[in-house]
Amino acid sequence: MTQMTVQVVTPDGIKYDHHAKFISVTTPDGEMGILPNHINVIAPLQVHEMKIRRVSEDDRVDWVAINGGIIEIKDNVVTIVADSAERDRDIDVSRAERAKLRAERDIAEAETTHDINEVQRAKVALRRALNRINVSKK
């Protein structure tokens, strides 16, 4: 069976390293499905839920919360360099819920003071928190 190596690397180290037969990521241009022997690519990534179908007898699917970064595909090695990333099993849901509430509060405060930059920053924080919450439920 043809397979590829998938690695997710953050400033804190390697967060994921397994063999897969399919992965799905989100770029600014939309969702991209990747199979073994994919053409070489480098692309930016959005905040998203990365789906990884591992090479295993039980057809296991892993989910990783990706908080921006880049993807490089070369010679059946997929490397994602992300600002931060967490596997579904490693997400602290209560921490993510607190981050969501904090971001919602920050958005409301920034909108009342018409601070556009703070609104945008808080919306990114909210998107990241929601992404982590969604991945934790997979």
UniProtKB/Swiss-Prot annotation:
Subunit structure: F-type ATPases have 2 components, CF(1) - the catalytic core - and CF(0) - the membrane proton channel. CF(1) has five subunits: alpha(3), beta(3), gamma(1), delta(1), epsilon(1). CF(0) has three main subunits: a, b and c.
Protein's UniProt name: ATP synthase epsilon chain
Lineage: Bacteria, Bacillati, Bacillota, Bacilli, Lactobacillales
Domain of life of the organism encoding this protein: Bacteria
Membrane topology reported for the UniProt record: Peripheral membrane protein
Keywords: ATP synthesis, Cell membrane, CF(1), Hydrogen ion transport, Ion transport, Membrane, Transport
Cellular component aspect of the GO annotation: plasma membrane; proton-transporting ATP synthase complex
Protein localization: Cell membrane
Keyword ATP-binding attributed: no
Keyword match Calcium: no
Gene3D superfamilies cross-referenced by the UniProt entry: ATP synthase delta/epsilon subunit, C-terminal domain, F0F1 ATP synthase delta/epsilon subunit, N-terminal
Family listed: Belongs to the ATPase epsilon chain family.
Function of the molecule: Produces ATP from ADP in the presence of a proton gradient across the membrane.
Any GO MF annotation of the entry: proton-transporting ATP synthase activity, rotational mechanism
